[in-house]
Amino acid sequence: ATTGCSCPQCIIFDPICASSYKNGRRGFSSGCHMRCYNRCHGTDYFQISKGSKCI
């Protein structure tokens, strides 16, 4: 867990069927998960993408 991360359970690292949030091979089941990842890792690299896709 990254120091300062307030939601360690929020991130999904395994491939999943993401409904709306995805980037490369990492998907998020919700916007919360995506925002938590971005905050914990100090990046805004992961953005919202349209459509559904298994990644």
UniProtKB/Swiss-Prot annotation:
State if Disulfide bond is listed as a keyword. yes
Q: Which domain of life is it from?
A: Eukaryota
Instruction: Give the tissue specificity.
Output: Stored in hemocyte granules and secreted into the hemolymph.
Q: Where in the cell is it found?
A: Secreted
Q: Does the keyword Transport apply?
A: no
Chief place of localization: secreted
Q: Which GO terms describe its biological process?
A: defense response to bacterium; innate immune response
Q: Which cysteines are joined by disulfide bonds?
A: C5-C40, C7-C36, C10-C32, C17-C54
Subunit? Monomer.
What does this protein's UniProt record list under function? Answer: Has antibacterial activity against Gram-positive bacterium M.luteus.
Q: Mind telling me what this protein is named?
A: Locustin
Organism expressing this protein natively: Locusta migratoria
